[in-house]
Structures are given as structure tokens and as C-alpha cells.
Amino acid sequence: MKKILIITDAWEPQVNGVVTTMTTVVQKLREKNFAVDVIHPGMFHTFPLPNYPEISVAWNFWDLKKKIEKSNADFMHISVEGPLGVTGRHYCLEHEIPYTTCIHTKFPEYVYERFGIGLDVTKGLLKWFHNSAAKTLVNTESHKAELEDDGFTDLVLWSRGFDEKIFYPCPEGGKQKYLLYVGRVAVEKNIEEFLKMPSELPKVVVGGGPSLKSYARKYPDVDFVGFKKGKELADYYRDAACFVFPSLTDTFGIV
């Protein structure tokens, strides 16, 4: 049985597209009889990311070497460009171990929206991180083309799917006639464009995030219902008149 080691700075209990993607990948790989080890922040001492307490950052990541060697995996994948990812990259290069990485989102645009850091700075760091990988997985053809224009190399398309047993259309169309946003409630999602736009229909927001409390106070006419999963989430989609997704920093957008 082949063993795959995944190193990720994004893992449960975080709720976001990266975590949804990677937990699903691990589940499906194990169903196909792969052995999968995951190294994640929950295995280390962590501190909450400033201004984003939902995200835990590992700080004693020098213990990563022992965990990699203990896994003795046949393949290695580094999912996120965080402290664990950077340390895992260094280990692989030092020991001449080929590995793959993944670009989940338009991170330079995300960082610019949240912190005002120039796009070229972040793109340079990402190229340094990813261009040493054997292959880098990307979500869409359009994002792949953008990254190639920016100088990223060895890119491979890795799209997404959904569980059609849970997510299927309502034959009658939206029953409750509201506008729906699903995703992280944060400034980089450009969600305020949705919240402030005029509409004759009520608005529903599914999800949480650092801007939830402030937006809920600012837009009391919007129904913020928090995180939802599985059938409950699917029901919100089925009952909506229209799904609105204003983000300018997403690639595929797992919501």
C-alpha cells in the first residue's frame, strides 16, 4: 500500500475551501486504499493569527522533521504556504525529495485586499515557494494561464467536484425567494458589495469570519445564519432565488 504524506497549515476545525478540499481528498484517497498521513497545526503548539483568530498558526514547527521521518511516506504533498509548508519544503529540498504543492486561491490579491501589500512582493514569494516543486496543482484553466504569465512553472490542472447526493437542484426553483451568499465573511471576499446593493429580495449570508460581527451590526436587514454543512447547506442553495458571489480573489470557490 502506497503512503501519501500531506503537510498543511489549514485543517480542521477551520472552515474554509482549503480545509474542505483537503479533508475530502484524504477521505477519497483512503477509500481507494491509499495510506494517508496528515501533518497539520493541531499537532503543534499554536497561536491565533492576528486579526483572524479562527486560524491557528503552528510555532514549534521545527518538530516537523521528526514527523516527516516517522511517516516514511512514498509521496509528499505540501498544501499551504504557511510555517509548516515552508519548513516541509526546506526538508524536501535538503533531502532531495520530490514533492507537489497546490495554489488554492489568488493569494497576492487576497493579501493586497487585507493588508495592502503589493502584488509583486507576494507573487515573488509564491514563485520562490512553488517553482521548486515537481508539480504545482491549480484549480482552473484561467488561473493556470494567469500564473504561467506571471512566471510559475510545472503547473497541472486539478479541478473540483461535488456530492450530487446532497447538492442537487430543486425542481420548482427557489422556494423562499432570497439572494444567497455562501463563504467566509471577510473583507477580501468583497462581500460588502453584496450586502449594500439594492434588492427587492431579502438577503441571506451563510458562513462566518472576522468581519461577521461588524457586518451584522452594519446591515441588520441581512440574515446572517452562520456556518452550515451538508444537507442543511444544500437546502439554502435550493431555496434561494439567486446565488451571489462577489469575491475577486477566489479561483474555483468551494462554498
Kindly give the residue locations of the regions a language model identified.
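Donor nucleotide-sugar binding/catalytic pocket of nucleotide-sugar-dependent glycosyltransferases
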Residues: G124-P169
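Nucleotide-sugar donor phosphate/pyrophosphate-binding loop at the beta->alpha transition
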Residues: P98, E109-W128
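Acidic anion/phosphate-binding donor-loop and adjacent secondary structure
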Residues: F162-K177, S214-A216
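Conserved donor-binding/catalytic core segment of Leloir-type glycosyltransferases
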Residues: P171-V206
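Nucleotide-activated donor-binding/catalytic signature segment of Leloir-type glycosyltransferases, i.e.
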Residues: K213-E232
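Short alpha-helical donor nucleotide-sugar binding micro-motif in glycosyltransferases
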Residues: D235-A240
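Aromatic "clamp/platform" in nucleotide-sugar-dependent glycosyltransferases that forms part
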Residues: L248
